[in-house]
Amino acid sequence: MFGYWGKILRVNLTDGTIKEETFNEEFAKKWLGTRGFGIYFLLKEMDPKVDPFSPENKLIFATGPLTGTSAPTGGRYMVITKSPLTGYIAMANSGGYFGAELKFAGWDAIIIEGKADHPVYLYIHDENVEIRDASKVWGKLVSETEKALKEEVGDKHVQIASIGPAGENKVRFAAVMNNGHRAAGRGGVGAVMGSKNLKAIVVRGHKRVEVADKGKFMEVIREKIEKLKKDPVAGGGLPKYGTAVLVNIINEHGLYPTRNFQTGVFEYAYEQSGEAMAAKYLIRNKPCFACPIGCGRVNYLPSIGETEGPEYESTWALGANLGINDLASIIEANHFADEYGMDTISLGGTLATAMELYERGLIKQEDIGGENEPPFRFGNTEVLHYWIHKIAKREGFGDILAEGGYRLAERFNGTEYFMGVKKQELPAYDPRGAEGHGLGYATNNRGGCHIKQYMISPEILGYPYKMDPHDISDEKVKMVILFQDLTALIDAAGLCLFTTFGLGADDYRDMLNAALGWDFSTEDYLKIGERIWNAERLFNLKAGLDPLKEDTLPKRLLEEPMPEGPNKGHVVRLKEMLPRYYKLRGWTEDGRIPEEKLKELGLEEFI
C-alpha cells in the first residue's frame, strides 16, 4: 500500500501488553483514516453505552494517508473516543508535528485500552514501543512535561502528545496537547487520557511515507499549493492575521456571539481582532507540518513571555462571549488554558454560562465560595485570571465548573442559559445570522461544533459560492450535508479544514489518487465521508441519542430574535429544516438510520 504502513499499535495499559496489528487496502478504501479508523474500532470493539471514564473506553490516535506527506497541511492527526462531556462520539483534530512523526515511526494509528495502575507514558521509537513510568511529570504543565520528557529520552527531536493537570483531574473538557499549543481540543479527549493514567505519548520516527507516483504527486501538490497561495483567505488573511482575522468579519456580519449569545455584535471587537493582535503582540508566524498557509501566531506578553495563539475561537470564547475586551488578558488566559490542557471553547462557554446564571440570580455569591471569590459578571477579567486555575485543579467552585456548562446550568436550574448542543458548548458563530450553520450545529455528531460542517464558508465567506444566510431551501440543506461529508473526508485524509479556502472536493480527489494509486471519483471519496458520518451517528444512537430531543439548539437561538445588527429580528428556523435534513440523509422521520441505508453504506456488520 502507498500512503499507509498498514500497521496499528494496540496498547493495553491494564496488563501492559503491546501488539502490532495490520490492515489491508480494502479496509483503507472503506475508512480512509483518522475518524474513519476511529469510529470503526469503537463500533466493532466497544459497547457505546460504556462509561467514558471506565477502562473499557478506548482512546484512539489516528493519522490519515496524507499525514506525513508533502500534501498541503499534511500533518494532521485525530483523537477518537467516547466523550465524557457529551456521552457520544468525540473526535478531536490537531496539527503541529506529532501526527507526521507518528507516521514516520511506521504507525497509522494507536489504540489505547485499559488503565494503568500508576502514571505512565508511551515511548515509541520506530518499531520499538515501551510503557514507561511518568510519576515525575504527573502534575506538570504541558510545557514542563514536554521539556522533561525530551530530556529523559535524550532526544530533542521527539514529538509529544500530552495532557496537563486538567486532563489528570478529568476536567470534562480537557484537551490533548502537542507542540506546546496545538490542541486536539474538543469533547474531553484529554480527560479520557487522564482517566487511563496516561500522561503522554512520545514519538520518534525515521521512515518516510511512500506515495504511488512521486513525480505525479509532486506535480499535483504544487498545483494545489499555488491555488491556496492565490486565495484571498488561505493566501492572504490567514497568513497575515491568523484565524482571528475572522473577528471583524463575523462581527460586521452580526453573528459574533456576545455575552453568552445575548447578541451578535460586540462593541469592542476590533480591540481583540487579528489586526489588533498583529499590531501589538505578534512576533512571527508558526506553521504546522507541510503547511503553506501558516496561520499560527507567536505573540509576546511581558507577563508570560512568548506564547502561541489565541486562535479566533479562543479569542472569542475568552473575550466577547464573556464581555471582556482586554486582549492582553485574553492572550494570557489562552496561554494558561493551553498549559493546563483545556479546550478554550468549552472553557469560555462554561464561564459565560456561569456569568449569566450569576447575573440572573441563579448562582449566588455564597455558592461560589463567599465574598472573597471573584464574581461572575460579564466583563470581569478577574474571572479569567482566577477561575481557570481553579477549574484545572478542581478546587472549590472550580470543581463544579470543571463539569462543563450544561451540568453547571442543570445544577442551578438554568439549562435554558446553556448555549450548547448535546452538552457541548457552542463555538463562535451565532446561527441566527447563518441558519444553515445552525442546522449543522443541531445535527453534529460531536455536539456543538463548527468545523465538522463549517457552513460559514458559503453563508458568510462565499466558498464555494455565496449563499443567503437566511435561505432555508433544500439547496441549503443539501449543502449542509455535503459539507458534513466533505469535512469527514478531509479529516480522514489527514488534512486541515483551512484548505477548503482555495480547494474543492476534486482537489482532494486528485491528491489522494496521486498518493495512493487509486482511481476513485470525487463521488467515491464523498461516499467515504458519508459512511463515516453515518457510522458516527450510529454510535451515538447506540449510546442513547434521542434525535428529536437532542438534534436541536438552545431556546434562545430558536425563539429569541437577534436584538440588533444585520440579523436583527432573525431566529433559526430549525423546525423547517430538520425534517428535510433527515429525509435527504435517507434517515427515518425520527432521525434514525434505516437498515437499508446502513447496508448501502457497507455498515451492515454494525446492525
Swiss-Prot record:
Name the domain of life this protein comes from: Archaea
Task: Report the co-factor binding details.
Answer: Binds 1 [4Fe-4S] cluster per subunit.
GO: which molecular function terms? 4 iron, 4 sulfur cluster binding; aldehyde ferredoxin oxidoreductase activity; electron transfer activity; metal ion binding
Residue positions binding tungstopterin: R76, N93, G95, R182, A183, G185, R186, D338, D343, R446, K452, D491, L495, L497
Catalyzed chemical reaction(s):
an aldehyde + 2 oxidized [2Fe-2S]-[ferredoxin] + H2O = a carboxylate + 2 reduced [2Fe-2S]-[ferredoxin] + 3 H(+)
Give start-end ranges for the coiled-coil region(s).
none
**Entry's EC annotation:** 1.2.7.5
Q: Which residues form the signal peptide?
A: none
What keywords would UniProt list here? 4Fe-4S, Iron, Iron-sulfur, Metal-binding, Oxidoreductase, Tungsten
Q: Which cofactor does it need?
A: [4Fe-4S] cluster; tungstopterin
Any idea which positions bind [4Fe-4S] cluster? C288, C291, C295, C496
User: Transmembrane residues, as ranges?
Assistant: none
Enzyme group, top EC level?
oxidoreductase
Concerning PANTHER family, the annotation shows:
ALDEHYDE FERREDOXIN OXIDOREDUCTASE, TUNGSTEN-CONTAINING ALDEHYDE FERREDOXIN OXIDOREDUCTASE
Family under the similarity heading: Belongs to the AOR/FOR family.
The subunit structure is: Homodimer.
Q: What is this protein called?
A: Tungsten-containing aldehyde ferredoxin oxidoreductase
Species of origin reads Pyrococcus abyssi (strain GE5 / Orsay)
